[in-house]
Amino acid sequence: MVGDGFRVHNFFPAAGIQNKQRMSPFFMLDYASPYHFPPSETQRGVDVHPHRGFETVTIAYQGKVAHHDSAGNHGVIGEGDVQWMTAASGVLHKEYHEKDFSQKGGTFQMVQLWVNLPAQYKMTTPRYQEIKKEKMGQHAFEGGMLEIIAGEYREIKGPAQTFSPLNVYNLHLNPSKEITLELPAEFNTGMLVIKGSVTIEDQLVSADHFALFQNNGTSITIKAKESATLLVLSGQPLNEPIVAYGPFLMNSWEEIEQAVEDFNNGKFGVLD
């Protein structure tokens, strides 16, 4: 449990994928599988904490999340929406179940990614992108819909601005339908099955499971056994040193020590 509102399973860099570079530029994937929270007058979540050197990407599948940060950004995302926070040089933030959702209770399902920043951008100015479902790029095909959050597919671009080449899609497949995705062979690619069960290259992958691909081809065929949703991640590796310490993701221990010092000296701003 992260805080008291995010009941998560970590797929990487823990579990069976301990190599911190294996899904670069994606460093971490925490998945809050569907879980029913009872009504509460207190908003569950994660209180104020710092980040530096990367981006947090929260994707809502069920439930609502409220965000506040020390750069003055705030917002609420619901089903199908995304918040993309660039911590970069340093920010404080907090994430909670949205007030009305907390009071009524309901099923909560989310993904949070940590996307590493190239060394040259780690100390850039923090920013916040709130991406509503209706603003995402859409590739409709006979068997369903591909929503492009970041990157592009067949010249359809996603709205998220990124610092390195990467793709983040939500793939929705109708029962017994399939799609063959064309993705760069040199990109690190993985897929999380959010709903339903699918065969990926003839291997069965059930809901709440993650499929990691070898970098040896450009075509991946996914076929739904039932109505299915998948999160597709594909990105060009950064091939830079990674040093992770708590909420900081840098390129050296000296930079980590500086991040800790700057945080302790109040340089990440103020957030109540």
Q: Where are the regions that the model predicts?
A:
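Jelly-roll (double-stranded beta-helix
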Residues: 1-272
